[in-house]
A protein has these predicted regions:
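Gly-rich Lys/Arg/Thr-decorated short loops/hinges at beta-loop-alpha junctions or inter-strand turns
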Residues: 1, 21-23, 66, 86, ...
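Conserved catalytic cores of soluble enzyme domains
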Residues: 1-117
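Proline-rich intrinsically disordered, low-complexity coils
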Residues: 25, 42, 62, 120-121, ...
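Generic structural motif recognizing short loop/turn segments at the entrances and edges of beta-strands
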Residues: 55-56, 135, 172-173
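Terminal amphipathic helices with adjacent charged low-complexity linkers/tails
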Residues: 92-152
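Non-catalytic terminal/interface segments that mediate subunit docking, oligomerization
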Residues: 145-182
Length: 182
């Protein structure tokens, strides 16, 4: 494993990130404080996971902000999981605790191939490929100007309603995620 500590400039880590980009899935789980040059590598990975109350990412800390700008901020306000999930968009997933974080990483990996020359995993989820969902006609109104819940539509379309939403809290008007279609 490459650590930013091994090279002050971080160049070797960034080079590894760019070399692996598009070749293997790169996932970062921030399970503590990550500051300075260390924050750049997770931002270059495909998916960033953060945990409420323990994950922090910022270029500098509250003490420097106070001395330079005269503002008092907490680590949560500066670069907590909520900030990076809702405002900056750096975090793709926000978890309540480490266990939820690892379970979501496992679920994400169930959708991804191990590398760019492999197909995504095929999982038998016991959904009938010939299934016709009549309720979709009721979910989508005839009037194109009426609103409807796209999450409900997606859950009816994907196999067994299995959908993993990415960046759920960032730009909530856009839905991006992974699902399976038989």
């Amino acid at each position: 494993a490459l650590g930013v500590q091994s090279e002050k400039s971080g160049v070797s880590v960034f080079f590894a990130n760019t070399e692996a980009s598009g070749v293997i899935p790169q996932i970062s789980a921030i399970l503590g404080s990550c500051a300075g040059i260390s924050v750049y590598s997770p931002a270059l990975t495909d998916f960033v996971f953060m945990v409420d109350g323990i994950s922090h990412m910022s270029i500098t800390g509250p003490r420097i902000i106070k001395s330079v700008m005269g503002e008092e901020v907490t680590m949560e306000e500066l670069g907590g999981a909520k900030v990076h999930s809702r405002i900056s968009g750096i975090a793709d997933f926000r978890a309540n605790n480490e266990e939820d974080c690892f379970l979501t990483i496992r679920k994400l990996l169930s959708f991804l191939p191990s590398h760019n020359e492999e197909l995504p995993p095929i999982i038998d989820i016991r959904d009938d490929p010939e299934r016709i969902d009549e309720s979709l006609a009721e979910l989508v109104p005839d009037d194109p100007h009426k609103f409807y819940d796209m999450h409900q539509v997606i859950s009816h379309l994907v196999d067994s309603g299995d959908f993993l939403e990415v960046k759920k809290e960032f730009a909530p008007e856009i839905i991006t995620g992974f699902g399976r279609l038989a």
